[in-house]
């Protein structure tokens, strides 16, 4: 029984016999937080969600009214037996990923879900304050490893200890204070390098001073706001790869074709503003490196009047971003010419990722600094690629199919030929746990509302009978979850008072 079925049954019972007075008792609250009920023999099991992302399982005996707690696995087994009468498998794999998160800091308040970066900045600043010497050593090592294609950034090998860093910070700030605020890095590079500092602190002496003072403040008295500002000024991303294998990915003539819609527009807009942001940040930090963005998708020989058969395509409105297309191949190595549904592409993704890796390394001349996956297939490809290249991985789901199809996990076998949910849900589970951070558009996407389950939350506990059951698949309190709303294109949406930009 679903939440609505349980609520309707309670309402009907109260309508028929209002004398019981259950309307104003704790039992009504119990019914309201019941998400699901299963009936097995004389027992009725309930999955309770008393508040956002909090779950409990209990069961009642219909004759004795005895109530007791149920284990997650036990509740899932009852569901399995309802789908397959008499089914019993004591050896079905169970997945509980809780132990893998024990050593990592976790959020505790449901209102904080999706604010992972803010939480980690607070946690890190607290650690820097509590373990002063260890934290300062960590910051020093962090700054020492920064480089781009062999070019050192931030610090050179003249600074080897924290005490030396303190001394050189004072000297560098004293020196920069004597220079005009608009003096460029190129004009002060030699003396700054003699102190142990490389490019990356700012383009002008004023910007360099601001960044150096932020570092001094962080070293002296760590504060999460100063730490966030300082980290935001450090150049870390010079090149990135965006993966979106399915559909017809192109800049024109693709919308309306199978598996092709809003995700394409989202990524193309994202690329334009990501490149601009990357360029501006690098420029302001005094680094003359052109950022590179590669959108990696599938090459489709039967392109149906689109550019999806072109291996390389520049993205309009960008300085240097490109679409890189890699074909799907069968086990014999032959290119698959026709479009393939997003539900049927799973056998091709591993070979696609290996081929994409070679092309990406050739174009970029090295590893990217960040890999962003999109949708289930792109996120799995991002997982495979990031593990091979040892690069930070970001996931963007766009839509998780599990919540779009009612009981798609429980009845996966019925839909397997058409949708291959067994592969997709497994890919989702792997990718979301492997990701370094996950971007969601809204809080509801992660943890739902007080009355509905979130898309990611639906992966916490579920079963696919005769395949495997998940006791704890993902922790929505993990700080890897971050909410970043898509926003709006300022070239399209602007104040009505800006009349010169309006169409005549």
What kind of region is each of these model predictions?
Residues 1-504:
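Catalytic cores of nucleotide-sugar-dependent glycosyltransferases that transfer UDP/GDP/TDP-activated
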């Amino acid at each position: 029984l679903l939440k609505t079925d349980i609520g309707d049954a309670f309402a009907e019972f109260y309508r028929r016999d209002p004398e019981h007075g259950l309307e104003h008792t704790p039992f009504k609250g119990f019914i309201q937080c019941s998400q699901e009920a299963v009936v097995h023999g004389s027992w009725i099991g309930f999955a309770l969600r008393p508040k956002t992302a909090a779950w409990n399982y209990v069961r009642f005996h219909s004759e004795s009214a005895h109530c007791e707690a149920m284990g997650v696995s036990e509740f899932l087994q009852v569901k399995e037996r309802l789908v397959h009468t008499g089914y019993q498998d004591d050896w079905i794999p169970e997945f509980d990923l809780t132990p893998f998160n024990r050593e990592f800091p976790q959020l505790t308040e449901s209102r904080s879900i999706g604010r992972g970066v803010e939480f980690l900045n607070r946690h890190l600043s607290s650690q820097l304050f509590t373990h002063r010497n260890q934290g300062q050593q960590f910051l020093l090592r962090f700054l020492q490893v920064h480089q781009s294609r062999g070019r050192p950034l931030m610090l050179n090998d003249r600074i080897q200890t924290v005490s030396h860093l303190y001394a050189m910070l004072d000297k560098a700030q004293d020196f920069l204070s004597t220079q005009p605020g608009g003096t460029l890095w190129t004009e002060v590079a030699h003396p700054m390098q003699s102190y142990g500092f490389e490019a990356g602190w700012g383009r002008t002496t004023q910007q360099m001073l601001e960044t150096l003072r932020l570092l001094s403040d962080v070293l002296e008295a760590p504060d999460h706001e100063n730490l966030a500002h300082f980290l935001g000024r450090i150049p870390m991303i010079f090149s990135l790869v965006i993966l979106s294998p399915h559909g017809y990915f192109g800049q024109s003539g693709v919308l309306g074709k199978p598996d092709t819609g809003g995700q394409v527009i989202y990524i193309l807009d994202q690329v334009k503003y990501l490149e601009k942001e990357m360029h501006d940040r690098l420029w302001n930090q005094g680094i003359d490196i052109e950022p590179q963005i590669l959108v990696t998708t599938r090459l489709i020989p039967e392109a149906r009047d689109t550019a999806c058969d072109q291996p390389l395509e520049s993205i309009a409105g960008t300085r240097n971003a490109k679409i890189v297309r890699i074909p799907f191949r069968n086990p014999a190595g032959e290119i698959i010419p026709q479009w393939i549904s997003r539900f049927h592409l799973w056998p091709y993704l591993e070979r696609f990722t290996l081929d994409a890796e070679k092309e990406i390394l050739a174009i970029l001349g090295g590893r990217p600094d960040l890999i962003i996956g999109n949708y289930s297939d792109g996120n799995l490809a991002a997982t495979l690629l990031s593990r091979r290249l040892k690069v930070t991985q970001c996931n963007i789901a766009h839509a998780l199919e599990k919540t779009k199809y009612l009981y798609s996990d429980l009845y996966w076998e019925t839909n397997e030929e058409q949708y291959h949910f067994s592969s997709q849900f497994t890919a989702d589970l792997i990718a979301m746990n492997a990701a370094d951070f996950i971007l969601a558009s809204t809080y509801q996407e992660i943890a739902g509302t007080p009355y509905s389950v979130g898309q990611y939350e639906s992966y916490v506990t579920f079963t696919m009978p005769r395949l495997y059951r998940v006791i704890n698949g993902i922790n929505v309190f993990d700080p890897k979850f971050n909410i970043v709303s898509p926003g709006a294109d300022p070239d399209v949406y602007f104040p009505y008072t800006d009349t010169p930009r309006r169409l005549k």
